[in-house]
Amino acid sequence: LASQRPEPIPVFAEMSSVNPIFVMTGLGDAKMDEIATGLHGSATLGAGQFCTNPGIVLFPAGEQGERFVESFLSKMRETAAAPMLHEGIRKAYGQGVETLAGRDGVRLLLAPEETAGDGRCHATACVLATDARSFLSDESLLEEVFGPSTLLVSYEDSSELNEVAEALEGQLTAS
């Protein structure tokens, strides 16, 4: 109908983007903590409903990567529930998290709390984790979960990092 108008109505839509963040090796702990702080702010801004929400974060495996994950998790645990746009979106968020958490090789590090009964349509943050090999073997992990969830993907070396980057389809943003 819109395309039949003398002047068609343009549609500008961003339909599903995981907006990957690439955390590189060789950064000091202070910089990693700074990245975790910024990531927390971006992942939870507006209950994760911004189109630039970082849904996938690649980080180096090993001790420094583990400290990064702990820093990020501590910040996400302190995040209060925030309002979703409507109940249908909140339900889809819960279903998306449940689907991801059920995939082989994915661990649920911080589960979202159920808030359906409070009448406020709020959601809490969620953090999941996997490794690059598991990520590459399951295309469903490329799907966006709309809301305050983050999938952390550890990589062993630059070769694995490049493989994951090549597997990602077009994205609205990447950092």
Regions found by a protein language model. Give the residues of each.
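NAD(P)-dependent aldehyde/semialdehyde dehydrogenase
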Residues: 59-172
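Conserved NAD(P)+-binding/catalytic subdomain of aldehyde/semialdehyde dehydrogenases
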Residues: 1-61, 109-110
